[in-house]
Amino acid sequence: MACNCQLMQDTPLLKFPCPRLILLFVLLIRLSQVSSDVDEQLSKSVKDKVLLPCRYNSPHEDESEDRIYWQKHDKVVLSVIAGKLKVWPEYKNRTLYDNTTYSLIILGLVLSDRGTYSCVVQKKERGTYEVKHLALVKLSIKADFSTPNITESGNPSADTKRITCFASGGFPKPRFSWLENGRELPGINTTISQDPESELYTISSQLDFNTTRNHTIKCLIKYGDAHVSEDFTWEKPPEDPPDSKNTLVLFGAGFGAVITVVVIVVIIKCFCKHRSCFRRNEASRETNNSLTFGPEEALAEQTVFL
């Protein structure tokens, strides 16, 4: 019974018996499930370019009828059939193909490009196509976090200060640590969020510390095999000399006492001067009376006044 099957969109019909076609489909399914049995593992950053090697040593023979497929899991990236290159829409304008080594170059990497890629080479033998080479390449992609930003976030109590560390734009999922002299400190309010569209992570955490001593605290963010960090330095405020306050108090008290004494002395002097003047005036008046009226008249006048 005839069997007409098509390997992929817009490719010629495969003219070989159904058992071999079924075997090929089983192979492609296994390619989409491969996680560890890969020939090579590569790690790149977002916006980088990567060369995925096919590792195929082609014999010196006619290659015009070879079929080369690059796939990512169960999705086709590009195909070369009868010398004609076809690139699938998701990879158009950002892929290059080396027709001598069958290598694939992807430009402007994005996070969605990560995964396991397979290079399949088929050759025509006795009228049918057989798989002659299979290479698996696992591509990991990371996005670098921004340099952490540490800010002061108030004082929960008199001798306690709170700081916040923040970073964004990274991938894969980060791990956060507060460190001082190599010792991990317990942070609070640590949050990790991921943007559903870009898949990039944002992370923030807070830490409370005692302000009565000096500190050098590190905010450390690890993601994949990379990390970023930032240091925060705190120096306790200088204290006043132990006797400076007492000196100021004593000086103020002494100055006040001096002013008080001066005021009292001035008042006493003014009072004495006034009293002395009053007595001199009285004595002068009595002398004048004695000279004017004589003793008897003066005595009579004094009696009248009494």
Curated annotation (Swiss-Prot):
Q: Which residues lie on this side of the membrane: Extracellular?
A: 38-246
- Give tissue specificity per the record: Expressed on activated B-cells, gamma interferon stimulated monocytes and non-circulating B-cell malignancies.
GO cellular component term, pick one: protein complex involved in cell adhesion
Return the Gene3D superfamilies for the record: Immunoglobulins
Task: Give the membrane topology, semicolon-separated if more than one.
Answer: Single-pass type I membrane protein
Q: Which keywords does UniProt give here? A: Cell membrane, Disulfide bond, Glycoprotein, Immunoglobulin domain, Membrane, Receptor, Signal, Transmembrane, Transmembrane helix
Annotated Ig-like V-type domain ranges read 38-135
Q: List the disulfide bonds.
A: 54-119, 165-219
InterPro entries, per the entry:
CD80_C2-set (IPR013162), CD80_IgC (IPR037676), CD80_IgV (IPR042711), Ig-like_dom (IPR007110), Ig-like_dom_sf (IPR036179), Ig-like_fold (IPR013783), Ig_sub (IPR003599), Ig_V-set (IPR013106)
Region named Ig-hinge-like: 227-246
Which sequence ranges are listed under topological domain Cytoplasmic? 269-306
Ig-like C2-type domain: from which residue to which, for each copy?
Answer: 148-229
Under the heading CDD domains, the entry gives:
IgC1_CD80, IgV_CD80
The primary site where this protein sits is membrane
Q: Which SMART domains match?
A: IG
Listed under GO biological process in this entry are: cellular response to lipopolysaccharide; positive regulation of alpha-beta T cell proliferation; positive regulation of T cell proliferation; T cell costimulation
Q: What happens when the gene is disrupted?
A: CD80-deletion mice have fewer T-follicular helper cells compared to WT, and residual T-follicular helper cells fail to mature.
Localisation: Cell membrane
GO MF, one term, reads: coreceptor activity
| TM segment ranges | 247-268
Signal sequence, start to end: 1-37
Report residues carrying sugar chains. Answer: 93, 99, 149, 189, 210, 214
Known function: Costimulatory molecule that belongs to the immunoglobulin superfamily that plays an important role in T-lymphocyte activation. Acts as the primary auxiliary signal augmenting the MHC/TCR signal in naive T-cells together with the CD28 receptor which is constitutively expressed on the cell surface of T-cells. In turn, activates different signaling pathways such as NF-kappa-B or MAPK leading to the production of different cytokines. In addition, CD28/CD80 costimulatory signal stimulates glucose metabolism and ATP synthesis of T-cells by activating the PI3K/Akt signaling pathway.
Describe its partners and assembly state. Homodimer. Interacts with CTLA4; this interaction inhibits T-cell activation. Interacts with PDL1/CD274; this interaction blocks PDL1/PDCD1 binding and thus PDL1 inhibitory function. Interacts with CD28.
| Protein name per Swiss-Prot or TrEMBL | T-lymphocyte activation antigen CD80
Species of provenance: Mus musculus (Mouse)
| Taxonomy of the source species | Eukaryota, Metazoa, Chordata, Craniata, Vertebrata
**Name of encoding gene:** Cd80
